[in-house]
Design a protein with these regions (language model features):
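Compact soluble domain cores
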Residues: 2-71
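Acidic surface patches and DE-rich sequence motifs
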Residues: 65-66, 74-75, 83
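A short, surface-exposed interaction/processing loop segment used at functional sites
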Residues: 77-96
Length: 96
């Protein structure tokens, strides 16, 4: 059983943008299913914690400006994509 407080769950979800999905929950579910294993996350909360930790430590990351003024930050083989408001759109392993 996964233990997480309501406060932590709300905090982790607050870092994410719904992007092109109808809700933040659908965006998170999609990205966890697509990238969870590659970042060694066994559950969605672990994935969100890793995304938050990476996002908080972007010093030295290469930054690429993408469509719609979103930004891709790449560092040590991982990436995070953020929207204009600074909310996470995706997190995963950088493919070369």
């Amino acid at each position: 059983m996964i233990k997480i407080s309501l406060g932590e769950a709300k905090k982790l979800l607050s870092y994410w943008s719904r992007g092109t999905f109808p809700t933040v929950a659908e965006s998170v579910k999609y990205h966890f299913m697509r990238h969870g294993k590659e970042v060694s996350s066994s559950n969605v909360w672990q994935y969100l914690r890793k995304a938050e930790a990476f996002d908080k430590n972007l010093r030295g990351a290469k930054v690429y400006i993408l469509e719609n003024e979103t930004s891709r930050y790449v560092k040590k083989g991982y990436y995070v994509i953020k929207d204009q408001a600074g909310k996470i759109l995706s997190f995963g392993v950088e493919r070369k």
